[in-house]
Amino acid sequence: MIINYKFSDFYFDKKLSGKEVEFSIQIQKREASSDKNLQSKNLIIDAINVQRDFSEKNKSSDNLEILNKQIEDKNDLIINLEKKVFDLTLENKKNIDDFNEKAKSFAKKAQEELDKYKLELKSFLENEFEEKKKFSFQKLFENIINPLNNFRLAIDAGSKQENSSIKSYVQGFEMLLNQTINILESYGLIIIRPEIGDTFNPEVHNAVELREEGTPNRILKINSLGYQFHERVLKPASVIVSK
């Protein structure tokens, strides 16, 4: 049997209050009862059971709707989280790419600086080697110039003697001195030979005496020659200078 039923506005279940519903009632054959009141109670109980069944079904439907809404909300949350993860992944990749690019640039500059340093070091060592090689005989020349000077002074003094035998010895010594100087010059020794009247140069001349004579700052007399090894002065020429 199909029955249309409208629930009262004051029905205890707020979800059903004021609503009109349609439901079916299955009436089972019962044994006849002579008690009219009992028959009436049975009908009321059947109606209440139908209402309860409907209420439970409606409640289940509402619960399903709530559950679907929760699932939808969770899906939205998952989508948002996935988007954030994707954005962070892109940002992280960009940061990694930027870092790799900077690392490559730094490594390139570091390699360039290292290569430059290697070239400078190589050049320095080569120059240092050449410098040491160039002046390797300096100590020898420093030790030999004083005896060489004394030998020259002795020759100059002997050449002024009237004795022919002494002069012959002096000539032989002078030849030996010139040969020695030629050999030393081939290894970089330079004789500083000032001339009388030359301008005094403090870098290669040593003024042992000043005289008020002639043009100022001129060489008046040479006491001894000077020596230098390549561009290094080992012993300046000893001179007398006008002031």
UniProtKB/Swiss-Prot annotation:
Listed name of the protein: Protein GrpE
A Gene Ontology molecular function term of the record: protein homodimerization activity
Lineage top rank: taxon: Bacteria
Assigned GO CC terms: cytoplasm
Matching Pfam families: GrpE
InterPro entries: GrpE, GrpE_coiled_coil, GrpE_head
Key words of the record: Chaperone, Cytoplasm, Stress response
PANTHER family linked: GRPE PROTEIN, GRPE PROTEIN HOMOLOG, MITOCHONDRIAL
Quaternary structure and interacting proteins, as annotated: Homodimer.
Gene coding for it: grpE
One GO process term, biological-process aspect: protein folding
Leader peptide range in chain numbering: none
Function noted in UniProt: Participates actively in the response to hyperosmotic and heat shock by preventing the aggregation of stress-denatured proteins, in association with DnaK and GrpE. It is the nucleotide exchange factor for DnaK and may function as a thermosensor. Unfolded proteins bind initially to DnaJ; upon interaction with the DnaJ-bound protein, DnaK hydrolyzes its bound ATP, resulting in the formation of a stable complex. GrpE releases ADP from DnaK; ATP binding to DnaK triggers the release of the substrate protein, thus completing the reaction cycle.
Similarity-based family: Belongs to the GrpE family.
Cellular localisation: Cytoplasm
Organism: Mycoplasma mobile (strain ATCC 43663 / 163K / NCTC 11711)
